[in-house]
């Protein structure tokens, strides 16, 4: 992966931490993780949260997308609870296989 993408991801993670978002894991997945990105690819990032029932994940994704726009509009955050992050979940399975 190129340094520029690493820098973008790290900047975004710092931005989220400054907003006091308490995720436990971050996964890069999708085309960038597979090194098959194009000029129009987004940067898929999965964020795993332990506060399973206390978070409205739709509102959280909206907040995370808003913050992403300040760093790089290609960032596509995917917040998930640790409870939902299992091999039985199709999105989690893809993240685990390609992330």
Residue ranges and their predicted role:
Residues 1-25, 34-39, 50-99:
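Catalytic core of pol beta-like nucleotidyltransferases
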Residues 44-48:
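Short beta-strand->loop micro-motif that forms the acidic, two-metal-ion catalytic signature
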